[in-house]
Regions:
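ATP-dependent carboxylate activation and anion-phosphoryl transfer catalytic cores
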Residues: 144-246
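Conserved N-proximal alpha/beta basic substrate-recognition cap immediately N-terminal to
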Residues: 1-31, 40-41
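Alpha-helix N-cap recognition
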Residues: 22-25, 51-56, 174
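Short, glycine/acidic-enriched loop or turn micro-motifs at the edges of active sites
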Residues: 39, 85, 200
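Active-site ExK catalytic segment of metal-dependent nucleases
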Residues: 8-9, 36, 108, 196-201
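Phosphate-binding site of ATP-dependent enzymes
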Residues: 58-135, 150-162, 167-170, 179-194
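Short beta-strand-to-turn element immediately C-terminal to the catalytic PLP-Schiff-base lysine
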Residues: 48-53, 94-96, 145, 185
């Protein structure tokens, strides 16, 4: 989790995976940053806001506090990170302790309200709407996407590094499904992957079934539920159920 020792940020750093710069002190903000703070009413959702300086941070956080959208307690625990602009992608993996192999189950991205509604408007209407309504980034679902093949090797490299880091710092390491969530950025004539977040569980998108990646391995696309079932069945056959349980 994000607020415990040796959390996902610790693991990403130890794995050598590129992440946005983290500002532990808002006074140190020196570029466009995104503040991720839990909502007051729904702690499982986060209220995001952008700022480019400490003054900007104070003004925007004060507005959210006055509206009771967030609390002072949660603001103190907020993650402040460099704003990275790119094509958002969630890389949904499955690691099998039985075969010691990493599989890419699929890739997807998020649908967010009211952001998606704003983005679908013509530019002139967007400008008018933004005079009265501020964007929100509340997750409402996912849809499947693909990435170009030249990025697949890099994605697998990140996944393998993360698995190795979990084994080193949290034995027995990650088991089964997890996702590295980030964006593909373009810089100096090449693309790179920046990871913002980690989902250490079954990812929230059933749409990964409709990407081609699991089909390359199995001959047909499979869901996370089916893949977990196959792992349990194999563990029972091998008498190694203990390897996939904690």
């Amino acid at each position: 989790e994000r607020d415990v020792p040796k959390n996902q940020y610790f693991l990403l750093e130890k794995a050598g995976i590129r992440t946005p710069k983290i500002f532990k002190d808002p006074k140190k903000i020196d570029r466009l940053a995104i503040v991720k703070v839990a909502e007051a009413k729904r702690a499982y959702e986060r209220a995001f806001f952008l700022c480019s300086s400490y003054k900007d941070y104070k003004e925007k956080s004060a507005e959210l506090l006055n509206k009771k959208t967030i609390t002072k307690k949660d603001l103190k625990k907020a993650i402040i990170e460099e704003y990275v602009l790119g094509a958002p992608v969630n890389f949904n993996f499955f690691y099998s302790p039985l075969s010691n192999e990493l599989e890419l189950m699929g890739t997807d991205t998020r649908r967010q309200t009211n952001l998606d509604g704003i983005l679908k408007l013509p530019a002139t209407e967007q400008l008018e709407v933004l005079k009265h309504i501020k964007p929100k980034y509340i997750e409402t679902g996912h849809y499947n996407v693909t990435i170009k093949e030249s990025l697949l090797e890099k994605a697998f490299d990140l996944g393998e590094k993360f698995v190795a880091a979990t084994k080193k710092f949290h034995p027995v390491g990650i088991i089964g499904p997890f996702a590295l969530q980030g964006a593909v950025v373009a810089e100096e004539g090449k693309e790179d992957i920046v990871i913002f977040d980690v989902s250490m569980r079954i990812p929230g998108s059933p749409g990964t079934l409709f990407t081609p990646y699991s089909g390359y391995l199995y001959g047909y696309s499979i869901s996370y539920g089916e893949r977990i079932g196959l792992e349990i069945k194999k563990a029972l056959e091998l008498g190694k159920l203990d390897l996939i349980c904690t």
